[in-house]
């Protein structure tokens, strides 16, 4: 974070009645998975909403624009796919990783969790896991994946 930042407390996006149950259920699902945790009011509050996907599931989105303005990003060099393919050429084995919700495998420290607070008309939640939408999330995730897979090269 940049020095001397001021917290941001935004207004909750309105949720149409037709989508309220679906949105609440997705919030509950993410709480059960340990991604979100219900919290009392805080200095930070970022509006969130869901979008409906073609497969009838929903995707949870948070507006981290105000947080991203206050972040100092530490870029991680993401390797080109052509480099990775050259490295595995001639390998005996290959595999695929299912990284659905991959960012959510990385725990946030308590200070980051306090900033990653989201608000709905019915309450506030804090992210306990790395959310999609934070400017540094791809760098953090790629760094963690590189560390975890380092010995497989």
Where are each of the predicted segments found?
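Retroelement reverse transcriptase polymerase core
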Residues: 1-153
């Amino acid at each position: 974070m940049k020095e001397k930042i001021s917290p941001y407390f935004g207004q909750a996006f309105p949720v149409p009645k037709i989508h309220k149950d679906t949105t609440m259920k997705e919030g509950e699902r993410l709480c059960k998975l340990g991604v979100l945790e219900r919290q009392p009011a805080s200095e930070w509050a970022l509006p969130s909403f869901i979008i409906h996907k073609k497969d009838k599931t929903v995707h949870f989105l948070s507006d981290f624009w105000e947080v991203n303005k206050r972040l100092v990003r530490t870029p991680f060099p993401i390797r080109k796919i052509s480099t990775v393919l050259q490295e595995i050429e001639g390998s005996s084995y290959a595999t695929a990783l299912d990284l659905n919700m991959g960012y959510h495998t990385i725990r946030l420290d308590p200070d980051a969790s306090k900033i990653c607070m989201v608000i709905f008309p019915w309450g506030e939640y804090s992210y306990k896991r790395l959310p999609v939408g934070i400017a540094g999330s791809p760098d953090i995730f790629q760094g963690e994946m590189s560390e975890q897979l380092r010995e497989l090269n």
